[in-house]
Amino acid sequence: MRNIIIILTAISFSCSSDHYTIEDFSKVEKIDTHMHLNSADPALTQQARDDNFKLLTVNVDVDDYVSVEDQERFALQQIEQSPDNLQYLTAFTLEGWDSTGWADRVISRLQNSFEEGALGIKLWKNIGMVYKDSADQFIMIDNPRFDPVIEYIIKQDKTVMAHLGEPKNCWLPLEEMTVNNDRSYFKNHPEYHMYLHPEFPSYEDQINARDRFVEKHPDMRFVGAHLGSLEWDVHELAKRLDKFPNMAVDMAARIPHLQHQTISNRDKVRQFFIDYQDRLIYATDSGISEDSNPDNERKDLHNTWIKDWKYFVSDSTLTSPHVNGEFQGLKLPRNVIDKIYRENAKRWFKMK
């Protein structure tokens, strides 16, 4: 009987050690690789320390944000306050795109940013959706004028993160979108709701340009933000990861799309995480600005982190305001959790 008890205890310990629990949340070192800290307020870095997170704050050329120069200033201020758990990506604009020397000016800016410690750059969807050249044509990411800039980044051993295109929902009417966070975003940002702008490049145009861009630069360390705008089907995303060994993706603001797919086929989504465990990076797209309420942002960030942890480590029945219907947590193995929450960020962004 004593031997049976010992064996059962060993089996129980082995099973529990193969997976994390919800209670392990604060014990595990984690990284959120997609934050926007556009303020000097330390609220989110303080929450990160409490929840055992390190952060990557991402500068980006967005009209709604302060300038990329001010974003970098905030990033460096935040890093000075929290040097052990915060790093950053820089960005550039397409101002003066058609002028002689545009690439040289961008490279000069990037050189300064890299000397300050930037781990790479972020490209945004205004490439392909907003910026036009002097001939009134949309500037797509595979345009050869980007090549010297990208080659410089590669030579510096830095990472290219890119939000190119949008969720496939962007080309649907609001009532046909699959997740509520997309429905809310495009209702509030009709300028980016491509269903309303059929004269703009199509979803396929955006994805094809991105694919040509990645194919053109096989030595580029590339992270497709937001599941690489292939959030609608993990099998479709898997095809790109198979084709491009230099590509990983973050999950920022697209975990609801994974949960939506989990409702109908949990095994498919879970197996995708296991099969591509080296290419998937945890991120939220959370942030703070100068007009934010720091206490509210801190609380929201903690709640987001907890809800995501439950989805990945447990097999509980869960709900989300972003998804219509219940879904079951994925209960991923411990080694997969370690990769998506920490090790992949270190590999793909060279985070410390």
Features from the language model and the residues they span:
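Hydrophobic h-region of N-terminal signal peptides that target proteins for export
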Residues: 7-16
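Sec-dependent signal peptide recognition
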Residues: 1-7
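Acidic-and-aromatic substrate-binding clefts and catalytic sites of carbohydrate-active enzymes
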Residues: 34-42, 61-71, 95-104, 131, ...
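Active-site gating loops and adjacent loop-to-helix segments of metal-dependent hydrolytic enzymes
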Residues: 51-54, 85, 132-134, 168-198, ...
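Hydrophobic faces of well-ordered beta-strands that scaffold small-molecule active sites
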Residues: 31-35, 55-58, 86-91, 121-123, ...
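H/E-rich (His + Asp/Glu) clusters that bind or coordinate divalent metals
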Residues: 198, 202-212, 217-352
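Active-site gating/metal-coordination segments in enzymes
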Residues: 15-23, 72-193, 198-199, 255
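An N-terminally biased module of ancient metal coordination in phosphate/nucleic-acid-related enzymes
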Residues: 16-85, 105, 344
